[in-house]
Amino acid sequence: MGLLAYIPTNVLATYLTLVLRSIGFTTFQANLLAIPNFVLHILLLFGLTWSTEKCNNRLGLSLLQPLYTVPLLAVLRFWKGTMFNKWGTYAIITLILDNPYIHAICVSLCSRNSQSVKTRTVSTCLYNMFVQAGLIISSNIYAKSDAPLYRKGNGVLFGLALFMFPILIGSKLIYVYINKQRDKRWNAMSEEEKDHYLSTTSDAGSRRLDFRFYH
C-alpha cells in the first residue's frame, strides 16, 4: 500500500513548478501558485484522519483517496487541454495534490495491528521503506522523451491510482475475514477454555486468538 499510494502526488509535487513554468507561468508565479495546495493538503489530512477515528472505518474511508484522484488523473491524462490550457492544467494538478492523504491512517494501522513493541517497530520500518521505494519509483515516471505533455507518464499515474481500489478493498476483506474466523473459534470456547488459553498460550501480539485487527 505504501509503495503505490503516494506515487501520483509525489510525481506531481516534484514537477509542479517545472510544469507551471513550462505552460507559461513565471518562476515567481509558479512559486506562489504552489502555496494553496499545501494549505488544503494539511486541512484534508487532519479532517480525514479525525474522521477515520470517529467512524472506526480506516480502510473504508481510505477509499476516498482513489475515488478522488482517479477522475482527476483521467482528466489530466485524456483531456486535450492538458499542458495547453494553463489555468485548467493548474487547477487539475492542484486538486490532485489536495487528495485525501492516507499516510497517517496507514501508519496507525501498522502500529495498532502489530500490538507488540517488537513487531510494531519492524512493521513501521517496513512500511516506511516501501514509502521511500515509492519515492524512488515516482522520480522515474516522467521522462524527457515524454515531455512536454507527459501523456505516457500521466497514464502510468492513472493506472497506479486505479490499482489502489483492489489493494484497499482486499486489505479490508482480509482483516474482516480473519476477525470473523477468530470470533468463531473464540465464541465456541467455554469460559474455562478461554481462561486456560489466556493463561497458557504462547501466542503473542496480533497472533493471539483474542486479538482483533483494526481496519
From Swiss-Prot:
GO molecular function: transmembrane transporter activity
One of the record's GO cellular component terms: endoplasmic reticulum
Transmembrane segments: 3-23, 30-50, 59-79, 87-107, 122-142, 156-176
Key words of the record: Membrane, Transmembrane, Transmembrane helix, Transport
GO BP annotations listed: transmembrane transport
InterPro entries reported in the protein's UniProt record: MFS_trans_sf
Cell compartment(s), UniProt: Membrane
Principal location: membrane
Membrane-protein topology: Multi-pass membrane protein
Family under the similarity heading: Belongs to the major facilitator superfamily. Allantoate permease family.
Protein's name in the database: Putative uncharacterized transporter YOL162W
